[in-house]
């Protein structure tokens, strides 16, 4: 974002890298951070934080939400994490389709499917907070999406739509 890019290479330890691309013909690697597990998806949350969604272990039995502090691009830090059991999930669409993730920093919502539809919020003091967990009719959760209008939230997919109210 801006002159920095954030990426994961999926090599052996799957670190988060920060690079300066202000000179596109001479990019510079500034920092890296090795953490347990790995992120499949990265999303700039605000000016100094990157949201990571991936797995907390090599067996991919736990989904991991991670917030990285990148205020110092030479020393990224994992400031919060949340593990969610996904051992019974048939597939996690967010692994290969970024559209399967709802990441809205302005509304403070993070949503995705893994057996159920999970909706989280984030704040720096309390970390990730589960707002809602909606059971889905089908265990194949591909195609489910979370959408909202004002304080009405909907989970739609596979011929069904569910509604709940977001806290004001």
Map each language-model feature to its residues.
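Feature marking well-ordered beta-strand scaffolds used for ligand recognition
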Residues: 1-168
